[in-house]
Swiss-Prot record:
It holds the Pfam family FAM198. It comes from Rattus norvegicus (Rat). InterPro entries: FAM198. Glycans are attached at N286. It is found in: Golgi apparatus membrane. The keyword Membrane applies. Disulfide bonds: none annotated. It is a single-pass type II membrane protein. GO terms for cellular component: Golgi apparatus; Golgi membrane. This is Golgi-associated kinase 1B. Residues 1-37 are cytoplasmic. Belongs to the GASK family. Residues 56-516 are extracellular. The chain crosses the membrane at residues 38-55.
Length: 516
């Protein structure tokens, strides 16, 4: 025991021996309680101050001992400490019993009110390691496994076609993309790191696309909206139409105009073709080619234009009417009466039937009436009052309505491998035509209508489906003024749908399933 410790014990013993009899005397005397309590409080305060001074002296000695000790001594944390006395000293149990002196590894522990350093000082917390995607170089004939997120956008777009369950883009993910093999002379990790692929103009925020759009439709829409333009090809069409060759083709999945797929770029006034494509899919007709709206950098005006997928499987048309089947209005009315190829019946030669199935004319008439497309069945504009800007007026065809039976139909197109069904092209519609000027000549001779389309028109879900479908095409949605502008177009279609239902009921036309 050191000298300061002995001195502290002597002082404690002396104070207790002097104060004890005086405290008893004060307690038993007849002094006022207020004065007695004051004396007791003063004595306790003096003794408490003495104890605090002793503890402070011990803390000072502990600080000096810590500074003199070795900093890297790790054995001090292995000594068990059963209790901490108030006088600041600490000794192992065996040294307290036999009175032996402390060993040099004495530890002093004091309570501090505030930490001078943070709990986790620098160097004690293991930092998080960032992921590194470096890929080692390989030999020319070797292969490297690369995660899909590290593949360059050009390589990823080309490889996506090999995965049938995946829809390319950020917004829809039908299935998990597997690992793929990359072939090449050298594959370096720095070249594979891409921060983020560009966002697609076809936006799908739900888990899947609308049910009326197939996976192939979505794939082709993304190709038209996001595919790089490789070159511009000459076309036989008039009106400033251009044929664009697109990159990112997939072998066998998209009909192309050669080794790469192509898109037919039209004028801004033909934007209604995008609306026509979505309406065709919602009605269950599936006769139009995929169409999207797009802005191109090489066009200076910056206005969005419709781009329609070019299908090389269509029967070429070199005549003036741009049709694979040359047919007049009079012949068309005779075909409607003969009901060619209905119920698998082979027509007789004297009927003059074409290879087109009878139900195809009903689908075309319904579709053209809703959009008021006159350039197929009424090229001379004989069923309504045309305007000066209409093609029939500009071409001087309006006076030819006296002999309508000889008027040739236009844009009647088939596929080479499927001549029974029609393909609707040049679907420029008109939304500004008033209800008292609708072209009912388009419905002349039609006695049956497709059940799938009529059921959608009668339901209350046509507006909801059109909004949901047109929202996918971001460029078209914004070009029409957002939802407010799209709602106005849908209002026109809904009014025409009610008029068509009234026409069907008034003329006793039948509604039949046409899913042959």
């Amino acid at each position: 025991m050191t000298c300061p410790d002995k001195l502290g014990q002597l002082i404690n013993w002396f104070v207790c021996s002097l104060c004890a009899p005086r405290v008893c005397k004060l307690w038993s005397s007849r002094r006022p309680r207020t004065r007695r309590n004051l004396l007791l409080g003063t004595a306790c305060a003096i003794y408490l101050g003495f104890l605090v001074s002793q503890v402070g002296k011990g803390s000072f000695q502990h600080g000096q001992a810590t500074n003199r000790g070795p900093p890297n001594n790790q054995d001090i944390f292995k000594v068990p400490f059963p209790e901490i006395p108030l006088d600041g000293t600490l000794a192992p149990p065996e040294s307290q019993g036999n009175g032996s002196t402390l060993q040099p590894n004495v530890v002093y522990i004091t309570l501090r009110s505030k930490r001078s350093k943070p709990a986790n000082i620098r160097g004690t917390v293991k930092p998080k390691r960032r992921k590194k995607y470096a890929v080692a170089s390989v030999a020319p004939d070797q292969e490297v496994l690369v995660r899909p997120s590290l593949i360059q956008p050009e390589v990823a777009r080309a490889a996506d076609a090999e995965v049938p369950g995946y829809v390319q883009g950020y917004l829809t993910k039908v299935g998990e993309r597997p690992w793929r093999m990359l072939h090449g002379p050298r594959v370096r990790g720095s070249n594979l790191q891409q921060p983020r692929a560009p966002e697609s103009n076809i936006r799908i925020y739900s888990e899947s696309a609308p049910s009326w759009l197939s996976k192939e439709d979505i794939r082709r829409m993304r190709l038209l909206a996001d595919g790089e333009v490789a070159s511009i090809l000459p076309t036989i069409f008039e009106g400033g139409t251009r044929l664009l060759m697109l990159e990112g083709s997939t072998s066998g999945s998209v009909p192309g105009c050669g080794p790469s797929p192509c898109g037919l770029l039209k004028q801004p006034l033909d934007m209604s073709e995008v609306f026509a494509f979505h309406l065709d899919r919602i009605l269950g007709l599936n006769r139009t080619l995929p169409s999207v709206s797009r802005k191109l950098e090489f066009i200076q005006d910056g206005r969005p234009r419709p781009i329609i997928l070019w299908d090389s499987s269509l029967v070429p048309s070199s005549n003036v009417s741009h049709s694979s089947v040359k047919i007049t209005w009079g012949t068309y009315q005779q075909l409607l009466k003969q009901k060619c190829w209905l119920n698998g019946r082979v027509p007789r030669p004297e009927w003059g039937c074409t290879e087109v199935h009878h139900h195809e004319w009903s689908k075309m008439a319904l579709f053209d009436f809703l959009l008021q497309i006159y350039n197929r069945l009424d090229t001379n504009c004989c069923g309504f009052r045309p305007r000066k800007e209409d093609a029939c007026v500009q071409n001087g065809l309006r006076p030819n309505c006296e002999d309508q039976s000889s008027v040739t139909l236009a844009h009647i197109i088939q596929r080479k491998n499927d001549p029974r069904h029609l393909v609707f092209i040049n679907n420029k519609g008109f939304f500004d035509r008033s209800e008292d000027n609708l072209n009912f000549k388009l419905l002349e001779g039609i006695r049956e209508f497709p059940e799938s389309a009529v059921s959608v028109l009668k339901s209350q879900h046509l507006r909801q489906k059109l909004l949901q479908s047109l929202f996918l095409d971001q460029v078209y949605w914004e070009s029409q003024g957002g939802r407010q502008g799209i709602e106005k177009l849908i209002d026109v279609i809904e009014r025409r749908a009610r008029i068509l239902i009234t026409y069907i009921n008034a003329h006793g036309a039948r509604v039949l399933p046409m899913n042959e």
